[in-house]
Amino acid sequence: QTNHKMMISSAKPLAIGLFTFTLIAYICLTNRFLADDFSVSYVANHSNSLLPWYYKITAVWGGHEGSFLLWVLIFSVWTVAVAIFSKGIPEVMVARVLAVLGMVSIGFYLFMLLTSNPFESLLPFYPVDGADLNPLLQDFGMIIHPPMLYMGYVGFSVAFAFAIAALISGQLDST
């Protein structure tokens, strides 16, 4: 029983840690874009030194790797929202929901690390300037569209996690 209590009590801090470290990764990638660090392959392929700062920020999600990092960041925002705003829900249920979200996170992080790493380096040889952001993505709509879309898409993972947690607990009614 003590072991279960430790696992249950560690769910919320782990969710907050997941968000914190994902946010740090996202800020680091955004910083590489703003600093025109073309030694990072993703930056070299989706930005250049003449791109305005606001498009450099949106270039972070201008390709697959950065878009996936944004997806994972928003997923971690939803996860920490469940951890923080679930005060009226039994602690065991919240822990199960966070465990389901954590398992999905592990899958996302493994996919990102193994196939879609946005921090892949071009060292020792890298271009003086980048290839530029796709001109179709240099639009105000692309500044707000992907984050808004992902908030909705990824938000459904919370409903999924609650459904799976209810199935695990056998609690399929309103009690």
Predicted regions and their residues:
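Polytopic transmembrane helical bundles with strong interfacial aromatic enrichment
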Residues: 1-175
